Amino acid sequence: MTITPQQLQAMLPLLIVGLTVVVVMLSIAWRRDHFINATLTVIGLNLALLSLYFVGQVGPLDVTPLMRVDGYAMFYIGLVIVASLATSTFAYPWLNGYPDNREEFYLLVLIATMGGILLASANHLASLFLGIELISLPLFGLIGYAYRQKRSLEASIKYMLLSAAASSFLLFGMALLYAESGSLSFAGLGKSLSDSMIHQPLILAGLGMMIVGLGFKLSLVPFQLWTPDVYQGAPAPVSTFLATASKIAIFAVVMRLFLYAPAADSEAVRLVLSLIAVASILFGNLMAISQTNIKRLLGYSSIAHLGYLLIALVAVQTHQLALETAGVYLAGYLFSSLGAFGVVSLMSSPYKGPDAESLFSYRGLFWHKPILSAVMTVMMLSLAGIPMTLGFIGKFFVVAMGVSANLWWLTGAVVLGSAIGLYYYLRVTVSLYLSAPETLVRDTPSNWALTAGGVVVLISAILVLVLGIYPQPLISLVQLAQPLM
């Protein structure tokens, strides 16, 4: 197969991140220097983000049978790279206190980013599986990077064992689909699996097993049990990546799969996804109420947010607004999560001490760091879906789409879940403004706003507010980012 210059241009983000991996490897072999390797990583990711401008000039293109680069892929590649940039930025001060090899952290983030880019442009079950494994395997190392701390190692082992089991289900489900359809490409599956075939037991079994595998990766009920433990055990910068880049990339490819293949037309599949959505919304929000650990709380809240997004997946074949809803919601979720986890990272001791994850650590933060507490307030209000924030725009789109698609009980679950979520998000917000305990020692540097992590957090807060008040630029961008069949 001959690759044309246009195809190379379409693969620029993947090629640049791959080249950055090689450069960072050579740099580590030449000399271990934390600052140089972190800088090379950030430069590589920024170049990959800028290269999307040149990718857009090529237009929708099938690069190989495994990859399709169009507006949809470009939008989600951009979100994944932004999440990776934020992760690398938050990790730098955390790694400064790390006693062992620090530079490999950036290698793992870059390799996982390649997996996310591959997933966003995947057009084939083979690239779907490769992308998921490429994003999951580095996470085993990243979650357990603080391996001297028992909980980090425990979280890594938990995630590794359960992820391996989920991958087995996913692979077996793909094999069953291939046995019946004779094709692994999304379009080929769409042509092969006609309406009459979709109800065959083998097809439904294959789809069911794929839902199990993907449900684990997306922390959907009942495959979510690992989520709070892993979020709590992982270092704060890694939790950022886990909550954003991996979820966004996997959800993007699942949306494309359901759009191309008629699996979503099966009433049985739609019913299962609807039940999972309601269970995820209610379980995630109800479990978050009792949490006193901010990372566990955000872990449970991510289960609920993916439940809201499943409603777009249920309606993706029948409703044009579904893709737009997913894009707006995921953009809002990305910036809100980056800000929330960014504040946790800034509040945490560089490696040596525990992360600032207890709600008690945030009590009275306003009286010591008013701007940082204002940022955390904005992020909590956005995740709760309060008007004038980007999170509200996403929730509004979900409810509007649910109503127009006549998914009444799912829309009711969104409203109920949002009402429950309001309680625990406001609980965090209120604690920021209470009187501060005198005994509490804070590790946040006084010049936090001038650090790279502080700048990322402030930009996230500004975007959440500005796009919450005037969302038209984001909506226009999402409308351009539609996959062309």
From Swiss-Prot:
Pfam families noted in UniProt: Proton_antipo_M
GO terms for cellular component: plasma membrane
The protein's Enzyme Commission number: 7.1.1.-
Signal peptide start and end residues: none
Keywords: Cell inner membrane, Cell membrane, Membrane, NAD, Quinone, Translocase, Transmembrane, Transmembrane helix, Transport, Ubiquinone
Assembly information from the UniProt record: NDH-1 is composed of 13 different subunits. Subunits NuoA, H, J, K, L, M, N constitute the membrane sector of the complex.
Annotated function: NDH-1 shuttles electrons from NADH, via FMN and iron-sulfur (Fe-S) centers, to quinones in the respiratory chain. The immediate electron acceptor for the enzyme in this species is believed to be ubiquinone. Couples the redox reaction to proton translocation (for every two electrons transferred, four hydrogen ions are translocated across the cytoplasmic membrane), and thus conserves the redox energy in a proton gradient.
UniProt-listed PANTHER family: NADH DEHYDROGENASE
The name this protein goes by in its record: NADH-quinone oxidoreductase subunit N
Organism: Yersinia enterocolitica serotype O:8 / biotype 1B (strain NCTC 13174 / 8081)
